[in-house]
């Protein structure tokens, strides 16, 4: 890959990370000290668009640090970092497994990525929520039981992230196509 393409790639990823952090910061809480995690949605978009392990892990680490700085959960800094890094790894491996199995083999890249987003958004958000709650429970404790927080925060977040994530993905994809960056 030449320097010009690397610069474009770095710039696009930085913008997507920034959008994720801004969405994470401005998203209101759902009546509990937790919120839907649209930062993870942007992380999934980065993973699908780049299909690169190093970029995935760097983006997961950076998103973890950024969301730790903007978390509204008391003591949620370390759980955010752990959650984003491991979620990025799990989602990357899941996507690699799907691609290796050739289930979506004959589809165009655009259709394949749309299907991957539709699968990854709910599953990845679920993994992220479980990792966050589990890590928070071990490190700082939870304000309510794990199961109550799972049902009242993680499950609604899965639904919200899936719907809004698909919309965000289409916006990002169309923008990158119009700019001839995809």
Curated annotation (Swiss-Prot):
Major localisation: membrane
Protein's GO biological process: amino acid transport
Cellular component annotations (GO), alphabetically ordered: plasma membrane
Protein location: Cell membrane
Keyword tags: Amino-acid transport, Cell membrane, Membrane, Transmembrane, Transmembrane helix, Transport
Pfam families the UniProt entry points to: TrpP
Residues spanning the membrane: 10-32, 55-75, 119-141, 146-168
InterPro entries: TrpP
Signal sequence, start to end: none
Membrane topology: Multi-pass membrane protein
Keyword Hydrolase assigned: no
Role description: Probably involved in tryptophan uptake.
Family: Belongs to the vitamin uptake transporter (VUT/ECF) (TC 2.A.88) family. TrpP subfamily.
Protein name: Probable tryptophan transport protein
Organism (species): Clostridium perfringens (strain 13 / Type A)
């Amino acid at each position: 890959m030449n320097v010009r393409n690397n610069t474009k790639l770095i710039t696009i990823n930085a913008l997507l990370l920034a959008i994720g952090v801004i969405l994470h910061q401005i998203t209101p809480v759902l009546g509990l000290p937790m919120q839907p995690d649209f930062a993870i949605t942007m992380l999934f978009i980065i993973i699908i668009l780049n299909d690169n392990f190093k970029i995935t892990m760097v983006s997961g680490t950076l998103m973890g640090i950024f969301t730790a700085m903007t978390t509204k959960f008391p003591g949620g800094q370390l759980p955010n970092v752990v959650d984003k890094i491991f979620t990025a790894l799990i989602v990357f491996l899941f996507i690699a497994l799907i691609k290796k199995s050739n289930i979506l083999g004959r589809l165009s890249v655009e259709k394949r990525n749309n299907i991957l987003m539709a699968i990854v958004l709910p599953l990845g958000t679920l993994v992220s929520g479980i990792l966050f709650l589990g890590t928070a429970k071990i490190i700082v404790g939870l304000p309510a039981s794990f199961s109550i927080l799972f049902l009242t925060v993680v499950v609604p977040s899965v639904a919200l992230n899936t719907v809004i994530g698909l919309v965000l993905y289409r916006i990002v994809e169309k923008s990158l196509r119009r700019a001839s960056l995809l």
